[in-house]
Structures are given as structure tokens and as C-alpha cells.
């Protein structure tokens, strides 16, 4: 894994922790960012990605939830906080960071779910984002599927 990939993975991990704190503790995003800057070595993190996700998810949470809800079999408020943060992060990246391949977005979210989510949380995260990807990345998903044939 390249150094840049490691930094992006670390950024997603920190963003997940920050978004969890935002959801559970209700702290402000700027306060969370300041705490994370003090408590973590941000030299080892893709700071642009961290900030994009940290600020992008809360500022567009209503839109992200509207995109996600059709693919979730219960109210989003009933989803585990870690898994909800992960599918929101994934939806944000699928929608807003088109330079990142959709498979990478899904895989990174699944790996974080395996590390931090419930027993089958990774399956839930994979299922939701896999269904959402064709809606947000229609041409990219279609091209990937046609290569498989």
C-alpha cells in the first residue's frame, strides 16, 4: 500500500471516529476538529480528505440520508451509529469525490465496518453502498460490469 493510500485510510478512520463523536455526543464539528488536531498526529493523515468528510457529511446529512433511506430496511435513526456514520461517509464520497473509484469507497467503508462495526455490520454497509453506487456513479458502475462479461 502506498503512503498516499495509507494516509487516506487513516483519514477515513479518523473521520469515522469524529462523525461518531458528532452523532453521539453532539459536539460541534469545529470543536471535534480541534480536539482531533491535538489528540492525533495529523501528519500521518490526508488532511484534505479528513476535513472534506468531517465537514461534508454533517453539512449535507439530510441529502445523504435521503439517498440512503431507500436502501435501508429500517429508519436511519435505528441504524447502529458506527454503521450509519460509515454509510453516510460512503454516500458522501460516492457523490462528492468522483476521483475516488466507487469500489475503493465501498471497500474502505467495509474494512472500517469490520474494524469498528457490529458482527455483521460490514455486510450491511456493503449492501447499502453497493445498491447506492449505481445511482450516483451510473457510468462507472456500468463500465465495471461490462468489463466483467
From Swiss-Prot:
GO terms, molecular function: RNA binding
Keywords: RNA-binding, Transcription, Transcription antitermination, Transcription regulation
Gene3D superfamilies assigned to the protein according to its UniProt record, in alphabetical order: NusB-like
Keyword Cell inner membrane: no
One of the protein's GO biological processes: DNA-templated transcription termination
Pfam families: NusB
An example Gene Ontology CC term for this record: cytosol
KW Transcription (keyword) present: yes
HAMAP family: NusB (MF_00073)
Protein purpose: Involved in transcription antitermination. Required for transcription of ribosomal RNA (rRNA) genes. Binds specifically to the boxA antiterminator sequence of the ribosomal RNA (rrn) operons.
Similarity annotation: Belongs to the NusB family.
Stored NCBIfam families: nusB
Protein name: Transcription antitermination protein NusB
Gene that produces this protein: nusB
